[in-house]
Design a protein with these regions (language model features):
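N-terminal helix-loop segment corresponding to the beta1-alpha1 unit
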Residues: 1-123
């Protein structure tokens, strides 16, 4: 579920792309869990080799996409983007008001990649 998007974005980084990881304020990134847990010096996400490996060299922002302010910030980021990779279940982006039609109206040449861990069908 949370594997495909981060890894696809990491491949893009490795090939020279500038990537901004958009994190949710509601849900912790599945990669944040550390095999070692929190330490005295570091929280789990700082100590997690998995989180650090898949997010190396990415920019990062935390947004509340259920809020209109967070949605507007993402739209602003999209206006300067070439590719958007999302790893949500079906219909989540549309529920946020961030479906492909909306985002392509902002940036017509935007390439949207949807990597749902649950498929794209409706049944």
């Amino acid at each position: 579920m949370f594997f495909a998007g981060p890894v696809a974005a990491q491949i893009a980084v490795d090939m020279g792309a500038d990537v901004i990881k958009v994190e949710s304020v509601q849900r912790i990134d599945g990669w944040c869990g550390s095999a070692f847990g929190d330490t005295e010096e570091l929280p789990a996400w700082e100590a997690s080799p998995f989180f650090n490996r898949v997010n190396r060299n990415k920019g990062d922002i935390t947004l509340n996409l259920t809020d209109s302010w967070g949605q507007e910030i993402l739209k602003h980021l999209v206006s300067d983007a070439d590719v958007l990779i999302e790893n949500f279940t079906l219909r989540v982006m549309a529920n946020f008001g961030l479906d492909s039609e909306t985002l392509k109206a902002i940036k017509p040449r935007l390439v949207m990649i949807s990597l749902s861990g649950f498929g794209m069908g409706t049944s």
